[in-house]
Swiss-Prot record:
InterPro entries: UPF0154. It is a single-pass membrane protein. This is UPF0154 protein MG335.1. HAMAP family: UPF0154. It comes from Mycoplasma genitalium (strain ATCC 33530 / DSM 19775 / NCTC 10195 / G37). The chain crosses the membrane at residues 6-26. Its main location: membrane.
Length: 73
C-alpha cells in the first residue's frame, strides 16, 4: 500500500510537470509557425500596397483599415 501511495505521490506531480513543459514547447512551435505563415500587417505595408495601386491614403484611412482588420479577426 505504501508503494502505491509513493508512486502516486511522485507520479502525478511529475506527469503534470512534464505535461506543462511539453505543452510550452508545442505552443511555442505552433505560434512561430502561425507567425511565419500569417505575419501581422503593419500600417506601412498598407500604405505600400495602396501606393502600388496608385492611391495615396490619408492617416485616417490607414487607421480605419487597421481597425477593420483587427475587428475581422
Amino acid at each position: 500500500m505504501n508503494d502505491l501511495a509513493l508512486a502516486l505521490g511522485l507520479g502525478i506531480p511529475l506527469s503534470l510537470l512534464v505535461g506543462m513543459i511539453l505543452g510550452y514547447f508545442i505552443s511555442i512551435k505552433i505560434f512561430k509557425k502561425q507567425m511565419r505563415d500569417n505575419p501581422p500587417i503593419t500600417e506601412n505595408q498598407i500604405k505600400a500596397m495602396y501606393a502600388k495601386m496608385g492611391r495615396k491614403l490619408s492617416e485616417t484611412q490607414v487607421k480605419e483599415i487597421m481597425r477593420s482588420i483587427k475587428n475581422q479577426k
